[in-house]
């Protein structure tokens, strides 16, 4: 009996290794075909990391050298940062610092006179759900038209928020109007009730409470030996950390970098909550984060496919791509991070997603 169990264990281990090797080969093939220098991916359940791997090179210029990818390499999350900002907002609601229906101008009455009256009733939840009508600020052209703001990051974001609230709102019949800028205004509310900057809140929750590593901004701005982002100019090239590219005004919407190990842990906390388990947040808070609105909840876009509810998000600053898909019905998550922000790389990412889901259904 013992021999049979040992034989079964060896067979099972062999099958797992074979599946991992197979998916690694397919990842390498996709990366070559779609010019992706480095990729990290994971499949996660509430109680298990099914697979997790990082492969490739930090820079396209190193592509003919020995691979230097490391499992702890950081990737820029882009707009997948929104789920982290939403998570922190959820944490503040549980600390009784703020409520989802808190109105912005009840916290900042001094800004009301100079703001557009159509914004008078906007709430924290509406800002995080893209239902407050805030202008999008999803393109560089919008930022180039801004006046010059003075001070540190927090002061500049506050001035940015004041400016945003003077603009006409986005008004149409869409279920939501995606806005990076709306998250900057939401962050201002979170800062007001906590007495801390958004940056301090991220450190409190991610680093101090959850023991997760992260960086703000591009990985290579913290360490040159981390992955570099890539864009086409017109050929694919790595983007130097000294490049004039500043996302600080919309940092709460899209400027955190994490490695696949710690980002997977963060996603796993969300899966546990969706499975009904309390952790740093209560299960009911996770339900609100994911399901408080049909089309776009708090940091997550929602869709129903074949009677299964999915939440997903794609993040990019134009140099990296980050994608996470969560099957709420199981729940299970698929995560793919790459250091190329081109449309071609995005096609490769979604092609690999199909392969990953087929290998680990």
Predicted regions and their residues:
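Short, glycine/proline-biased beta-turn/loop segments that scaffold the active-site neighborhood
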Residues: 99-115, 209-210
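Short, well-ordered beta-strand elements
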Residues: 312, 322-340
């Amino acid at each position: 009996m013992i021999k049979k169990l040992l034989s079964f264990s060896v067979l099972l281990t062999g099958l797992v290794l074979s599946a991992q090797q197979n998916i690694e080969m397919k990842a390498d093939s996709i990366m070559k075909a779609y010019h992706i220098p480095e990729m990290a991916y994971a499949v996660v359940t509430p109680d298990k990391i099914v697979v997790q791997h990082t492969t490739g090179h930090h820079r396209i210029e190193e592509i003919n050298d020995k691979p230097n990818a490391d499992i702890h390499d950081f990737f820029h999350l882009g707009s997948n940062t929104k789920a982290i900002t939403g998570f922190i907002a959820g944490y503040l609601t549980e600390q009784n610092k703020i409520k989802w229906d808190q109105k912005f101008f009840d916290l900042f009455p001094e800004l009301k006179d100079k703001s557009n009256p159509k914004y008078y009733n906007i709430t924290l939840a509406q800002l995080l759900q893209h239902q407050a009508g805030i202008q999008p600020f999803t393109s560089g052209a919008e930022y180039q038209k801004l006046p010059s703001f003075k001070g540190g990051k927090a002061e500049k974001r506050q001035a940015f928020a004041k400016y945003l609230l003077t603009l006409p709102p986005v008004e149409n019949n869409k279920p939501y109007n995606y806005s990076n800028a709306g998250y900057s205004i939401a962050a201002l509310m979170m800062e007001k009730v906590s007495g801390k900057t958004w940056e301090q809140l991220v450190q409190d929750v991610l680093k101090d409470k959850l023991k997760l590593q992260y960086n703000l901004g591009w990985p290579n701005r913290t360490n040159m030996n981390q992955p570099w982002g890539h864009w086409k100019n017109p050929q694919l090239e790595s983007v130097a950390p000294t490049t004039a590219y500043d996302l600080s005004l919309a940092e709460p919407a899209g400027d955190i970098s994490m490695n696949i190990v710690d980002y997977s842990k963060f996603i796993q906390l969300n899966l546990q909550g969706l499975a009904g388990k309390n952790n740093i947040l209560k299960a009911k808070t996770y339900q609100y984060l994911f399901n408080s609105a049909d089309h776009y909840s708090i940091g997550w876009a929602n869709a129903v496919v074949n009677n299964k509810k999915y939440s997903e998000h794609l993040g990019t600053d134009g140099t990296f791509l980050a994608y996470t898909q969560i099957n709420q019905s199981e729940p299970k998550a698929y995560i793919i991070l790459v250091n190329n922000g081109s449309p071609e790389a995005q096609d490769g990412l979604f092609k690999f997603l199909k392969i990953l889901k087929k290998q680990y259904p």
